[in-house]
Amino acid sequence: VRLLTTVTALRCYLQKVARENQDLINSQGLVFGDQTNWFKTAVGLVPTMGNLHPGHLSLIERARRENLTVIVSIFVNPLQFAPHEDYHRYPRTWEQDCQLCEQAGVDAIFAPTPEIMGVVNTSSETQMVQVTPPSAMISGLCGRSRPGHFQGVATIVTKLFNLVQPDRAYFGQKDGQQLAIIKRLVADLNMLVEVIACPIMRDASGLALSSRNQYLTVGEREQAVVLSQGLKQAETLFRAGGVRNSIELIASARQKISIVDDVFLEYIELVEPNTLIPLAKIQEEGMLAIAARLGSTRLIDNTILRDRQPIIAIDGPAGAGKSTVARQVAEQLGLVYLDTGSMYRAMTWLVLKADISIDDECAIAQLANESTIKLTHSLNRDHPVKVWINDYDVTQEIRSLEVTSKVSAISAQSAVRRALVIQQQNWGKHGGLVAEGRDIGTHVFPNAEIKIFLTASVGERARRRQQDFKKQGQPEVSLEQLERDIAERDWKDSHRQ
């Protein structure tokens, strides 16, 4: 793992990574037009304040799976600590952190000093440009007792995004208010980074993992478990009892927590997870959030309550049978079948119809963001979903050999995926659907109740694809050619950004 402590070193490292990526493209013998199919490799950033624990490692492990280059930042941010808070005693475990990063396969650690990050002293908020999130998002929950905290977080996260310029950044759901603010920051400032929310990690007792847990005595750790138990009791009332109003849910959690006298509740609130607006009743989803003090330690925790039918996400390589299985599961369970593969095929058809070159990423990005895809139920068992794009019925056209040969190149383009993911996630807000496609359970519906990864050998997938072509009356294609095409698509899919 490379240890970087200055901006100059970080930029030099990122330039080196970019050159190596270009060399890899060249070594594969790709011409310029093929680079659209391959795409530059992704950089994943995991921002931390050090003192790494299994919760951080879960973020790093996910970043490792989804990116070629993983950078972990370690910076104890003075701007997010008030004068009376624990900045100077916040645990710093540099050697241990480096060892854990090495074991987790991290490529580089960026560990700047406050001076390198422009923080000259703890009162420097008056001396440097700061990022201030919307007041409605920072005035409630933790912001009520920690004025200035989220301005400090937003300022340093913005600086990290500008310095590293990652494709993806990973944050834990435990800091639910921070997560919502960072998502809003990225959206409002048009940052080209995808914020990945990762589940809360807990120990065997249910206590949410936190660097501040080490402040707790053995007895206090046992008492602190009551926070997650209170959330669990409210969650049970929500799921089994059908309770949706905030008064009853909050009262349930409060009643459970009150059995431990030493736990001082700072707040229990029900808010909308993305806007942080207080909720009187859950319509779609709500975040039940808690902050409490136990001795001298401040702890936070939360749970997301979703009022929707389940989402089933089926992932896997091309030709593995995802569509067939998804259709059958949807039919058996009475759920909606969201055919994401057909959406990418429809976009590919539109690109070809518009006579746009597949390596003209800018034109394709504009087309994707101006297009609307609709999926409607069909009585045709071979094509139970009718596909419309910009009011054109393209159900049959998207199965042509020409579309099939180009769809991987189009779906590999990040702008296309972003545009279609927005449409897919809008359909998924109310749940009750079965969705299939690459990365469907990680990027599109990370909170799906059931996730399935379906695979098959290249030979079996080629055989199925040949049978599909015959049913559709398409020209005969040899198994050998189909196997080569599928192997090529697997490679492209595994090397896309």
Residues of each region from the PLM?
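Nucleotidyltransferase catalytic core that binds NTPs
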Residues: 1-271, 277, 286
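Conserved nucleotide-sensing/catalytic segment adjacent to the nucleotide-binding pocket
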Residues: 356-381
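Short beta-strand-centered segment that lines the nucleotide-binding/catalytic pocket of NTP-utilizing
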Residues: 333-350
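Walker A (P-loop) phosphate-binding loop of P-loop NTPases
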Residues: 319
